[in-house]
Amino acid sequence: MEGWQRAFVLHSRPWSETSLMLDVFTEESGRVRLVAKGARSKRSNLKGALQPFTPLLLRYSGRGEVKTLRSAEAVSLALPLSGITLYSGLYINELLSRVLEYETRFSELFFDYLNCIQALAGTTGSPEPALRRFELALLGHLGYGVNFTHCAGSGERVDDTMTYRYREEKGFFASVVIDNNTFTGRHLKALEAREFPDVDTLRAAKRFTRMALKPYLGGKPLKSRELFRQFMPKRTVKTKKD
């Protein structure tokens, strides 16, 4: 791919004494593995640009699995992520690295990713809504089609107060049992609309996306989730004094 295209670095690691091995997500080619020769040398002007969450324009060449980076320019400064939003950004980067095949085009997903990073950078509240919307978009692009609005058993529209159990590749079926794998009709409508007005619908969305993403991730845990658990401060619960 000799032409310029928009991209983000998902992950980088040292490669030889002066180079970097990059995992990048591009608009036209999807996920691509690149060697950035000399990027670690003192004279390189690429050091600051080849960082996660920095919008890039880049060119590369090569026919094998690992391509060679020819040029890269930062379109702007890195989007400002810190604390909980930084860990959230690292999570979606790792998610893409785990589930996307190399060199499969996902142009619409690229903009879903950009929108998610921008939402994380601009949020003053919880990052959870942005993460859930991105996960649902990713599942859709992977071909994971789900009908949230109709019961797969009866064909009728879901009812807010009824409970439904999800069966993989079949849909949601009415259930009299309530457990961690069931959802109310209200939850399903929130998932369809990608709108999560309260903690209850957010938790339901998280349960569903974890369930749906599990086959793509296999048994290997995400490192970013473990980092989040280790380094983010625990929330303290304030109690009223008598």
UniProtKB/Swiss-Prot annotation:
Keyword DNA damage annotated: yes
Entry keyword annotation includes DNA damage: yes
Annotated InterPro entries: ARFGAP/RecO, DNA_rep/recomb_RecO_N, NA-bd_OB-fold, RecO, RecO_C
Gene Ontology CC terms, in alphabetical order: bacterial nucleoid
GO BP terms, alphabetized: DNA recombination; double-strand break repair
One Pfam family in the UniProt entry: RecO_C
Entry keyword set: DNA damage, DNA recombination, DNA repair
Quaternary data: Monomer.
Family in the record: Belongs to the RecO family.
NCBIfam families linked to this entry: reco (TIGR00613)
PANTHER family: DNA REPAIR PROTEIN RECO (PTHR33991:SF1)
Chain's role: Involved in DNA repair and RecF pathway recombination.
Name of this protein: DNA repair protein RecO
Organism encoding this protein: Salmonella typhimurium (strain LT2 / SGSC1412 / ATCC 700720)
